[in-house]
Amino acid sequence: LPTDEFHFCGFLPVKSGQRAKRLAKLLDLPGTLALYESPYRITKLLGELAELARAREVVLARELTKKFEQIQRGTAAELLESYGEKKPKGEFVVLVGQALGSAGKQSADEMN
């Protein structure tokens, strides 16, 4: 994923309405997004990204710097499918690439 411009976004809100609003705003930003997500909400986030950001490349990095570190790459739908019945374990860093052919609609300064 491109690193010339990225936005560290931390954790998304837990409440659905606030979460959807924040995610929609973040997806308008140019560059790569870096999010944190818990194992309890990672499949929810992947489902949301599969709907809102179908063609974007997503990287899931689990348990970074630990013995069972794992990094997966694909679309959100592909990554969601890879979990199937398995319960996700560990904390996740989620990287979301920008839309292909899109420079983004607003800058981070405009968003705040």
Outline where the language-model segments fall.
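Class I SAM-dependent methyltransferase SAM-binding "motif I" and its flanking Rossmann-like core
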Residues: L1-L29
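A contiguous loop/helix-start segment that scaffolds small-molecule binding in enzyme catalytic cores
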Residues: T32, Y36-N112
